[in-house]
Amino acid sequence: MAGYLSESDFVMVEEGFSTRDLLEELTLGASQATSGKVAAFFVADLGAVVRKHFCFLKHLPRVRPFYAVGCNSSLGVLKVLAELGLGFSCANKAEMELVQHIGVPASKIICANPCKQVAQIKYAAKHGVRLLSFDNEVELAKVVKSHPSAKMVLCIATQDSHSLNHLSLRFGASLKSCRHLLENAKKSHVEVVGVSFHIGSGCPDPQAYAQSIADARLVFQMGEELGHTMNILDLGGGFPGLEGAKVRFEEMASVINSALDLYFPEGCGVDILAELGRYYVTSAFTVAVSIVAKREVLDQASREEQTGAAPKSIVYYLDEGVYGVFNSVLFDNTCPTPALQKKPSADQPLYSSSLWGPAVEGCDCVAEGLWLPQLQVGDWLVFDNMGAYTVDTKSLLGGTQARRVTYAMSRLAWEALRGQLLPAEEDQDAEGVCKPLSCGWEITDTLCVGPVFTPASIM
C-alpha cells in the first residue's frame, strides 16, 4: 500500500454488519447527547468505493480513472481513491491544494476546468501541475502568460441534449473552432497533447460517448497535422452512480470499448482517461437528518376511506434542506425518499406528510406527497445514495457546512484494498457469478451494443 489510508481512518466492520447498523448506533448516541445540538451526519461505506473501482477496471480495462474532487472532497474518499492509484481531476486551487496535502503527486493531477482564474493557473505552474484543459482563445492566452510549460487538453463540445446537466452550454469548443484553436496554440508555442469531452450527468444515451469519441478522433487528426503530439483522450464523466440508473454502467462500458477499438485501437499510443465523481461515491454515502419541528394541518378532504390514514397532514421541518445536503432537488430534479430510523408497527396510521428544510421561504421543500406514521421532534430520517455534491456543499444559509462523516469498511474490502485484488485475478470460469468484490450486477454476454457513430463532418 502507498500509505494514504490507515485503519485509524475508518471503522472496521465485519461482514454482515451494514452501514444502517452503524447509523442506528450513531443516531442513538446523538439522540442521547446532552448538548441539545443535533446536526445531520453521514456514514460512508468505503468498501463500496473499492468495489466500484474494481468494477470499473473490469469493464473499462484500457481507461485510467481520475476522480472528480468537486463531487465529494471528504478526506476518507480521497485517501481510499489515492490508495487505489487514481488520478485526480481538480477544478480550482483549493482542490489541487487538498489532494497535494494528502501526498498526491502533481503528475496525477489534471486541472480540468477549461475556464480558470489566473491565480489557479499560476498555482498549477508553481506546484508542478502541468496538465490543463482549455476550450477558447482567452483561456489559451492566460496559459501562455502564466504557465507556458503546461500541456494542454482541448475540451470539445458534445451532444448532451438528453443529459440532466447540459455542460456543453458552458464548456467545450465546437468542431468548427478546433483547428483555429490548435493553430493559435502552435503559434504561441503551447503544447496541446490531447482532447477531452463530457457528455453531462444523467445522460440516458450511451451512444453519446461513441459520437464524442468519433469527434475526438477528428480533432486528433487536426492536431497531428499541425505538429502537436496528441496522446491523451479524456472521456470526462457522466457515468451513473446508482445501480438502478436508466442505463447500466456495463452498457456504457460496452459502447465505449467498441468506439475505442474503432477510433483509438490498442497500441495506438494514446493514454485514455475518464473523470468520475458520482460513479464512485453516490451509493457509498447515507445521511441521517433529524426532525427539528413539526406542524399538523387539517385536511379539507379526508382520504381515510381509501388509505386508512387519519384526516390530517403533517409538515416536518429538518435541519437540512435544498440549499445544503438536498441540493439535488433543485439541480437534478430528484425526489428524496426517507427510510425511518425507527421501524413503525403495522397498525400505525399513515399521514400525508411533507419534509421542509430550515430556510424561511417557499422553495425549501425536500419532499412532499409522502405517507408516513406519526413522527416526533428528535426522530431521525435516513436517506440513501447521498454521496454526490452533498458532504461539502456551501449553504446559502450560512457558509460552508462542516458535516460529520463516519467512514466504515468491511475487513474483506480492506484486505482487498491492501492486496489490490483485481477481478482479473479471480476465477475466470465463474464469469456469471457475482463475487463479493464484483460490481454488484450479474454479468451478461449479451449486452446490446448499438452502431458506433462516424465522425461528423466539419464545414
UniProtKB/Swiss-Prot annotation:
InterPro entries: Ala_racemase/Decarboxylase_C (IPR009006), De-COase2_C (IPR022643), De-COase2_CS (IPR022657), De-COase2_N (IPR022644), Orn/DAP/Arg_de-COase (IPR000183), Orn_de-COase (IPR002433), PLP-binding_barrel (IPR029066). The keyword Transcription regulation does not apply. One of its GO terms (biological process) is positive regulation of catalytic activity. Expressed in the medulla and chromaffin cells of the adrenal gland. Expressed in the Langerhans islets of the pancreas. Expressed in the inner part of the seminiferous tubules and in spermatozoa located in the lumen of the epididymis of the testis. Expressed in the cortex, hippocampus and cerebellum of the brain. Expressed in normal and neoplastic mast cells (MC) (at protein level). Expressed in testis, pancreas and brain. Expressed throughout the differentiation process from spermatids to spermatozoa in the inner part of the seminiferous tubules. The keyword Glycosyltransferase does not apply. Keywords: Cell projection, Cytoplasm, Cytoplasmic vesicle, Golgi apparatus, Membrane, Nucleus, Polyamine biosynthesis, Transport, Ubl conjugation. GO terms for molecular function: catalytic activity; ornithine decarboxylase activator activity. Ubiquitinated, leading to its proteasomal degradation; a process that is reduced in presence of antizymes. May also be degraded through the lysosomal degradative pathway in a proteasomal-independent manner. GO terms for cellular component: axon; cis-Golgi network; cytoplasmic vesicle; cytosol; dendrite; endoplasmic reticulum-Golgi intermediate compartment membrane; granular vesicle; mitochondrion. Antizyme inhibitor (AZI) protein that positively regulates ornithine decarboxylase (ODC) activity and polyamine uptake. AZI is an enzymatically inactive ODC homolog that counteracts the negative effect of ODC antizymes (AZs) OAZ1, OAZ2 and OAZ3 on ODC activity by competing with ODC for antizyme-binding. Inhibits antizyme-dependent ODC degradation and releases ODC monomers from their inactive complex with antizymes, leading to formation of the catalytically active ODC homodimer and restoring polyamine production. Gly-70 is present instead of the conserved Lys which would otherwise be the covalent pyridoxal phosphate binding site. The N-terminus domain is necessary for its localization to the ER-Golgi intermediate compartment (ERGIC). PANTHER family: ANTIZYME INHIBITOR 2 (PTHR11482:SF4), ARGININE/DIAMINOPIMELATE/ORNITHINE DECARBOXYLASE (PTHR11482). This is Antizyme inhibitor 2. It comes from Mus musculus (Mouse).
